[in-house]
Amino acid sequence: MKAVGFNRPLPVSDENCLLDIELPAPELRERDLLVEVRAVSVNPADVKVRAAHTPAAGQYRVLGWDAAGVVKAVGSGVQHFQVGDEVYYAGVINRPGSYAELQAVGERIVARKPRTLDFAQAAALPLTALTAWETLFDRLDVNKPVAGGSRALLLVGGAGGVGSITIQLLKTLTDIQIIATASRPESENWVRALGADFVINHHHNLPEQVAALGIGAPSWAFSTNHSERYLPQLAELLAPQGRIALIDDPDVLDANPLKSKSISLHWEFMFTRALRETADIARQGEILAKVAQLVDEGRLHSTATQTINGINAANLRQAHQLVERGDMVGKVVLAGW
């Protein structure tokens, strides 16, 4: 089968950082689906692994943690899917990814794709939707009020892939006021269109901007990037006993500013359930099914903003360049082989 992989960490400026390769079709485990991949999306996780991971000698690493496609075969223990089902999923970081014509993925972290979306539009959603949903409802527990805090959440990085779906989930499923950060006119317009109630600039003082809104101290904050830079400001502006979640990988993170307010800090890693095979691993498939339902009801929308035709090394390198630039609005997807 066709695939795209890498055999050594190279900068995205090197045309050999991703390579077109041929691999045997994957073998299925008991609960696996064999999916014919029709579309993929690129996330910061792809970029980080490509730039830092060294595969074993003579081996290729296949990235890709967003896909939509068609089930071509099922393992002997599969219970909920059949050949021909159109599905979408993020997968798990310790198995070969979706930059391949065929991918094996456990059925418990898969759902049928939204009927109203094509494969490219659907492929933009899984990783970011799971990240946003788990952050809001499993980590921050936004349905549990913070005593004395305003029903408001500050989202640092509102226009990226995770931020774009976070805003929609909050607007659709809660009555929480959304304060999103954006620093350019196009990103500000994007987050307002998605449903942000207030937009502030993350290059300026956050506590001063939040105070000027006149809505009180927010109960929650969600930092999607540069958390080491923003954490002291989040500690200052949040209500006592508020909650902060983050998804990035700071080299050093000083949490001491949180102590005097008893602010809790929550890490979200979308791969935890599948990587650790937790008892509630099937929740990821359930979340994706709920997201698909909300999309088909017109209450959520794909965050795909750019589609590249053709899943190959050259096009994936282009997509990696867009993501590495750090100013993506929405998601970039690739469709077709």
Task: State the predicted function of each range.
Residues 98-99, 182-190, 252-255:
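Short, glycine/polar-rich helix-capping loops at beta-to-alpha or helix-loop-helix junctions
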Residues 229-300, 336-337:
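Glycine-rich phosphate-binding loop and adjacent beta-alpha segment
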Residues 299-306, 317-337:
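C-terminal capping/lid region of NAD(P)-dependent oxidoreductase domains
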Residues 85-86, 102, 243:
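Residue-level marker of beta-strand positions
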Residues 94-107:
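A structural motif shared across PLP-dependent enzymes of the aminotransferase-like
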Residues 205-216:
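Short amphipathic alpha-helix with an adjacent loop that forms part of the alpha/beta core around
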Residues 123-204:
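Mid-domain Rossmann-like dinucleotide-binding core that forms the NAD(H)/NADP(H) cofactor-binding site
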Residues 24-41, 51-96:
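Glycine-rich beta-strand-centered segment in the early N-terminal region that forms part
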